[in-house]
A protein has these predicted regions:
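Non-catalytic, glycine-rich low-complexity segments
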Residues: 1-33, 110-128, 133-135
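Carbohydrate-binding surface patches
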Residues: 24, 522-557
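Active-site-proximal helices and loops of the catalytic beta/alpha 8
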Residues: 235-243, 253, 258-269, 328, ...
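Aromatic/acidic polysaccharide-binding cleft in carbohydrate-active enzymes
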Residues: 148, 160, 377-383, 424-446, ...
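C-terminal beta-strand-rich structural cap/linker in extracellular carbohydrate-active enzymes
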Residues: 29-31, 566-580
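Hydrophobic faces of well-ordered beta-strands that scaffold small-molecule active sites
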Residues: 141-143, 199-201, 245-247, 335, ...
Length: 580
């Protein structure tokens, strides 16, 4: 038995509360394992005396996920008294081994006279410890908007801007196009018709950049975008249409005109706000240049985005009060935390406690590009931007030698990182303002459509970057931040793309199993790059086929969504979604 491949700890994804009554236990094994039993019971089932002989009840575990080198076995328990003690019985072709908290034992060695068995325990299921992201997020279809580039809805005076909204050549990071909040309000019917139920806005606060990630004043809407009244109208109008609103917030760093930084610039280390930032040198050096010299910290090495000390209780209190105002006065439904893995855990815990007290259903999203387990324990973020999902999709289509098993391994790894309830609200996306446009990255319309189909048929809270529904193209920033081509949209130039996206969104809404956790994978030895998976439901199962080959494949089916499927033939690079 390959003992090195076996792993379990009684925490996070290995052992957690699914809800107020259920506990999920997972164990990772090698592929030589043929079965696993959980031996479990209440820790006090036989009394509390030190001389009792505790015996666990056997319960077969289910092989839930296959990874490249491992199996993940799982079981769901509903312990009567909300606590459980346990160990594992593992079977291979020729061995039976027991796993306790202190290691592996044979049946004989485990029962040696005088041995003190170290069992795993879930001590008690406390209601307040359950990871419980807002349930509504799992049913939400998000749409990400860069306000300056989405729609220009008013003619009030604004800083320099392109004369022609349709100008998309030679865009720089310093261009302004005049998009605003009123433009977003005007296009809410368009978003509702598309099937969108949540909008995520890039920062809207006072700043001198088009992206607003160097915030000058967290209390003022940038006048280029409109007024506080415009934002309130946007939120209220969106809510009337069944659309939630999430704001982007930057707490890792501020802009140079932020009042606290300006006070430091004027007074140096005598400023009462000196400890609001991560400054390493005294006396304070008043210069703007790369931060590679280490005089103070900032975002990357940018001197116009000085890093806030989010471990400072005064900083926590200030921004807690700011966000409290946003939630109470504006009625927003979520906050996205920029550079979310560089903000202190204590800051996030403070924000979670403060804001969830006001609105327990507030959605807190972190921008993190990596395994985010340490931020998703229930007292910080509800979800993160799921870059591992995005990257795994890209890597499969880049590697033409990868087969359907490799795709399964990649997706199963993504969904093994976090608890089930977190997987349901992971912020899945194909592109953002920080990446190439999806179509440009994919390099072909077929691959782009395949990835859209995956986005809308796997667990998570999918997000469409503005323009992805019309197959907008663009390289890395700033090319991925072009204006929305409303003239061409209204002329019907992108109807085919819009119809494709709308149909997938409608499908996701119609079939709840597409939002559930369970995925069953299938593989075809004759067509190794034919991706196929089931999404089982209570009444029926939905099956997804993605033909990533250059040949036609006969598949008789009851289709509910197709692309390049005719007369029971799934053509090369086609998509088939059907009931089985």
């Amino acid at each position: 038995m390959n003992l090195h491949a076996i792993a379990h700890r009684s925490l996070f994804t290995d052992c957690y509360a699914r809800n107020e009554r259920e506990i999920i236990l997972n164990i990772r094994t090698g592929k030589d394992i043929t079965g696993v039993n959980l031996l479990f019971d209440d820790p006090y089932a036989y009394g509390i005396s030190g001389d009792i002989h505790w015996i666990g009840r056997p319960l077969p575990m289910r092989m839930e996920r296959e990874l490249k080198h491992n199996y993940v076995y799982t079981v769901k328990l509903t312990p009567e008294y909300r606590r459980v003690q346990y160990c594992f019985e593992l079977f291979s072709a020729d061995e039976v081994i027991y796993l306790y908290e202190d290691g592996f034992y044979t049946a004989e060695s485990a029962e040696k006279k005088g041995r003190l068995k170290q069992y795993f325990k879930f001590p008690y299921l406390n209601k307040c410890d359950v990871i419980a992201p807002p349930a509504w997020a799992a049913d939400t279809i998000w749409y990400q908007i860069m306000p300056d580039r989405f729609c220009k809805g008013s003619d009030h005076p604004k800083r320099m801007q392109h004369k022609d909204w349709e100008d998309r050549e030679g865009i720089t990071g310093f261009d302004f196009f005049g998009g605003d909040l009123r433009g977003i309000i005007q296009k809410l019917p368009y978003l509702k018709d598309l099937g969108i139920t949540g909008i995520y806005l890039l920062p809207v606060f006072l700043s001198d950049t088009n992206h607003k990630y160097n915030t000058f004043d967290y209390t003022k809407i940038d006048p280029d975008f409109g007024t506080e009244e415009d934002l309130i109208e946007l939120v209220n109008t969106a809510h009337d249409m069944g659309i939630r609103v999430m704001l982007d917030a930057v707490f890792n760093h501020s802009g140079t005109e932020f009042f606290a930084w300006q006070d430091i610039w004027e007074k140096g280390e005598d400023s009462e706000f000196f400890d609001w930032f991560v400054i390493h040198r005294k006396p304070f050096e008043r210069k703007y240049a790369s931060l590679r010299d280490g005089r103070f910290d900032g975002f990357a090495f940018l001197d116009n985005m000085p890093k806030l000390d989010t471990g400072n209780p005064k900083v926590q209190k200030y921004f807690g009060d700011i966000c409290t105002y946003w939630v109470q006065k504006w009625g927003i439904d979520g906050i996205r935390f920029d550079v979310g893995n560089e903000v202190s855990h204590r800051f996030l815990q403070y924000m979670n406690r403060t804001l969830k007290t006001i609105n327990p259903e507030l959605f807190l999203l972190g921008e993190i590009w990596m395994d985010s387990a340490q931020w998703l324990r229930g007292d910080e973020y509800d979800s993160v931007m799921n870059y591992p999902f995005f990257e795994s999709l890209q890597n499969f289509w880049v590697d033409e030698d990868a087969d359907s098993r490799d795709f399964m391994y990649a997706m199963n790894r993504v969904y093994s990182l976090y608890p089930e309830q977190t997987n349901a609200v992971l912020f899945n996306h194909l592109d953002t303002h920080d990446t190439m446009r999806a179509l440009t990255r994919c390099g072909s319309l077929d691959i782009f459509y395949h990835q859209q189909a995956v986005l809308m048929t796997l667990p998570g809270s999918p997000c469409i970057y503005y323009g992805t529904e019309i197959a907008m193209e663009g390289g890395h920033d700033p090319d991925c931040r072009k204006t929305m081509p409303w003239r061409d949209i209204e002329a019907g130039k992108f109807t085919d793309h819009q119809t494709f996206t709308k149909a997938l969104i409608a499908l996701r809404k119609q079939y709840p199993q597409l939002r559930d956790e369970k995925i069953v994978w299938h593989h075809d030895a004759m067509n190794p790059r034919l991706v196929c998976y089931d999404r089982p439901g209570e009444q029926e199962t939905i099956r997804v086929y993605l033909n990533n080959t250059e040949k036609d494949i006969p598949i008789p089916a009851d289709p509910i969504f197709t692309y390049k499927y005719e007369n029971a033939i799934l053509k090369a690079n086609g998509i088939l979604i059907c009931r089985i």
